[in-house]
Amino acid sequence: MPTINQLLRKKRIKPVARNKVPALQKQPLKRGVCVKVYTTTPKKPNSALRKVARVRLSNGFEVTAYIGGEGHNLQEHSVVLIRGGRVKDLPGVRYHILRGNLDTQGVANRKKRRSLYGTKKGK
């Protein structure tokens, strides 16, 4: 524990909280255009082909965003909405694409948790 004199000489340093989603610039959502839509493989114990897209945002940032749900209709030049939220087993993927918004269709035949996947209520 430092003495009062030591604290007068050098103040306690506060930990700097780094921004986990810098490209959003403190906004909840951001619009962007898909530059490239592709699949990639996750980190080590997992195995799959995860669907991701490289998106150029309206503020000039270019980020990699995850496309959740089964199947999608995205291709190059699709206009999408992204939100924050990383994918734990994909390094560098810190954003999610919102389903059922702009050019992105909702997940077909989805019955549960539909609001997360932009699916309309089935009859």
UniProtKB/Swiss-Prot annotation:
The modification 3-methylthioaspartic acid is found at residue 89. GO terms for cellular component: small ribosomal subunit. GO terms for biological process: translation. One of its GO terms (molecular function) is tRNA binding. Signal peptide: none annotated. Pfam families: Ribosom_S12_S23. The keyword Mitochondrion does not apply. InterPro entries: NA-bd_OB-fold (IPR012340), Ribosomal_uS12 (IPR006032), Ribosomal_uS12_bac (IPR005679). Keywords: Methylation, Ribonucleoprotein, Ribosomal protein, RNA-binding, rRNA-binding, tRNA-binding. Belongs to the universal ribosomal protein uS12 family. Part of the 30S ribosomal subunit. Contacts proteins S8 and S17. May interact with IF1 in the 30S initiation complex. With S4 and S5 plays an important role in translational accuracy. Interacts with and stabilizes bases of the 16S rRNA that are involved in tRNA selection in the A site and with the mRNA backbone. Located at the interface of the 30S and 50S subunits, it traverses the body of the 30S subunit contacting proteins on the other side and probably holding the rRNA structure together. The combined cluster of proteins S8, S12 and S17 appears to hold together the shoulder and platform of the 30S subunit. This is Small ribosomal subunit protein uS12. The lineage of its organism: Bacteria, Pseudomonadati, Pseudomonadota, Alphaproteobacteria, Candidatus Pelagibacterales.
